[in-house]
């Protein structure tokens, strides 16, 4: 087997106003997990998109199985045994699991797609690697964790020797994340190499064989779990000492700001997802909602934010009954929402940073007057957000 499965050699990649990768070199060996660690904006996703053929490097080389290659697109990478599970899944929601997995590489029989053969192969792969899934389920009906399994099976179906995973646990429950890490370790026992992109320190120390840390597009450290610690990794990521354990004083909650009484909410199929739910949230406290995905969490969030109306029950915000309130009414009361799928439900990708920054308030002063948007005010607001929260963008108009 090749000594180096995948490597970047002195890769540099620029975008307008941003040096995303600056002379970056990494190497992945067979049967090992290489963790690519860094803050948001460190250049991790750009680097793996170069390795997968989605971007062409401005300088430097990509090496696959000891051969320097010129990738013209993902097809080139896939044909050379590189698979990738993107942070935002590349699936066709109305199609079945098996159809998504074999799409573009369908088995045929007498000139027709042989779905029976495809289904058998998918079942065999899913059982072998502990990725059990219904091959005939519609992807749009699957929770996010199951959709990720579809993406992994897509790569395995194409006989990947390398699996690149971009922030794979960001959408998973802790139990699902633990299961995934076990699956990845099992995959490496077959000789497969894995590039694991994350900013979660505990996962890196638990699963990685080798660790590369990126900061501001540059490699600032290479190590192994036995040679470092959470504190050491955090310091490499941000360039300064980091306090990982914060002493918190006891909560001193104030008035009730959200009250839910006997709430009943149906899911997309009309089945009861929440049944007689009761709770209160007071000012100054954090309420955690735990549970395996698909047990009503999404329906609860959508009911609170006005995206889904309860069939029974009452919801009060600051003492005002808003059970059937619209998203605009609820937002006006000070309720903010960061959705599970930020790309699909949180932003408008074709809009600029400035335009996205006022999506839920464009109709209010000072951003508009008598229905006319005030572009200068919007840009100024967006720049304030970028400065305050360290948003990594060349400017607010992209």
Describe these PLM feature segments.
Residues 2-398:
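Glycine-rich phosphate-binding loops of nucleotide-dependent enzymes
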